[in-house]
């Protein structure tokens, strides 16, 4: 990824 993305829980 080129920028921080919100982490989606599995």
Swiss-Prot record:
Keywords: Hypotensive agent, Metalloenzyme inhibitor, Metalloprotease inhibitor, Protease inhibitor, Pyrrolidone carboxylic acid, Secreted. This peptide potentiates the effect of bradykinin on the isolated guinea-pig ileum, does not potentiate the effects of bradykinin upon blood pressure and inhibits the angiotensin-converting enzyme (ACE) from rat plasma. Belongs to the bradykinin-potentiating peptide family. One of its GO terms (molecular function) is peptidase inhibitor activity. It comes from the Eukaryota. Expressed by the venom gland. GO terms for cellular component: extracellular region. It is found in: Secreted. This is Bradykinin-potentiating peptide F. The keyword Metal-binding does not apply.
